Amino acid sequence: MGKTTKRFQELLKKVEENKIYNLDEAITTIKTLASAKFDETVEIALKLNVDPRHADQMVRGSVVLPAGTGKTVRVAVIAKDAKADEAKAAGADIVGSDELVEDIQKGIMNFDVLIATPNLMGLVGKVGRILGPKGLMPNPKTGTVTMDVAQAVNNAKSGQVNFRVDKQGNIHAGLGKVSFSKEQLNENISTFIKAINKHKPSASKGRYVKNASLSLTMSPSIALDTQEVMDLK
């Protein structure tokens, strides 16, 4: 623990206290904070001026990051017949229907993303209580309930990130690896922020983004200029 604390203190020296960073500065600085023995994830944290207890202030959706997430994503698809064939052809790792649901009921879930065709959502509903808490329940808002299973598989494989505001109005997401180039990180972060701004509820009044910051898996956070964040459209 002492070793970790000492390392963290050293990293803190690289971040100017009370400074608000523009995006370019933040990305340049964040890359100097890599200190772990693995390729750390670049994470964004946003505090939005919304009250998600009200349905008209929920912020939820998905976006495909141009440079991907840097992760290998295992995709499962609940589909039958021609749609099952399409999913397999698109590169889905697991494809099935009743037997796949039975596996989920047994706790066998060797996937990171689950996609389903609308006509089989009744079947998926049988395991909703298992999938829901794990964030794996297919949902039309994230493009995981669809007849276009091939596109959904491609999106998931190529870096789709789902986002949903929590009860306190926060959104967290991993937007790539610290080994990515500055250009790749800038593109990913900008694309994600634009998606958040696009989903601004009409019921949200005043400053939409109250706080924004970047960090690595094991680093201090860097405060972002919220006006610059809100100006990304």
Swiss-Prot record:
Coiled coil region boundaries: none
Subunit structure: Part of the 50S ribosomal subunit.
Annotated GO biological process: regulation of translation; translation
GO cellular component: cytosolic large ribosomal subunit
Function summary: Binds directly to 23S rRNA. The L1 stalk is quite mobile in the ribosome, and is involved in E site tRNA release. Protein L1 is also a translational repressor protein, it controls the translation of the L11 operon by binding to its mRNA.
Domain of life: Bacteria
Similarity comment: Belongs to the universal ribosomal protein uL1 family.
A GO MF term: tRNA binding
Pfam family, one: Ribosomal_L1
Protein name as catalogued: Large ribosomal subunit protein uL1
Keywords: Repressor, Ribonucleoprotein, Ribosomal protein, RNA-binding, rRNA-binding, Translation regulation, tRNA-binding
Organism: Campylobacter curvus (strain 525.92)
Chain's gene name: rplA
The keyword Phosphoprotein appears for this protein: no
Keyword Repressor in record: yes
